[in-house]
A protein has these predicted regions:
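Long, contiguous binding/interaction regions
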Residues: 2-184
Length: 184
């Protein structure tokens, strides 16, 4: 879906350099390692790491896919959409599309997650309740094409994403922003 060589990646140890070496001591299970205690709990428990959006846009989108030509999947998706709206009313849930829309080649609906707490509750729930459907999870970082490709995670079978319309949308948005800047 995406060529990782198109992007650069900061070191995962950024901000954690120059610390003492980790111990090689094994835990009681003999397999895992004993980790040194943290001085404070990671902020990732309460806010998404940069560059993921922590505002009104939402940190993650979850696109739940179904084959609109399969009556069983359409029925399951419709019931799942209702269940999500009832069990997770704090989440933003969009229309159930029974046809391709935007970069999505098949029927789907979208759910927005705003906090790590919501992510931690909803994704394990969805792993069980997605049934025969697939789900695309992606962060919202402002890099829409990369978010839908290189940063995407799938539950179930991966579907192709039509990145062409997404690229054109991004280009049009950037052009409009440039025109508005020029007017100011």
């Amino acid at each position: 879906m995406s060529d990782p060589s198109l992007y650069t990646y900061p070191s995962p140890l950024q901000g954690w350099e120059n610390l003492p070496p980790l111990p090689n001591e094994r835990a009681a299970d003999g397999k895992s390692f004993v980790n040194p205690p943290a001085t404070q709990k990671s902020t990732a428990y309460t806010e998404f790491p940069a560059p993921i959006n922590n505002g009104i846009r939402g940190g993650f989108d979850v696109h739940i896919y179904f084959l609109q030509s399969d009556p069983t999947q359409v029925q399951y998706a419709t019931k799942l959409w209702e269940r999500i709206r009832r069990e997770f009313p704090e989440l933003r849930v969009y229309q159930l599309w029974d046809r391709p829309i935007g970069p999505h080649y098949t029927g789907m609906f979208e759910v927005n997650l705003f906090t790590p707490e919501q992510f931690g509750a909803f994704i394990p729930w969805l792993v069980i309740w997605r049934g025969p459907l697939s789900a695309l999870l992606h962060p919202n970082t402002g890099e829409d094409v990369r978010d839908h490709s290189q940063r995407a995670t799938w539950l179930g079978q991966a579907f192709p994403i039509n990145l062409g319309p997404l690229r054109r949308f991004v280009e049009a948005k950037e052009k409009k922003e440039e025109e508005e800047k020029a007017k100011a």
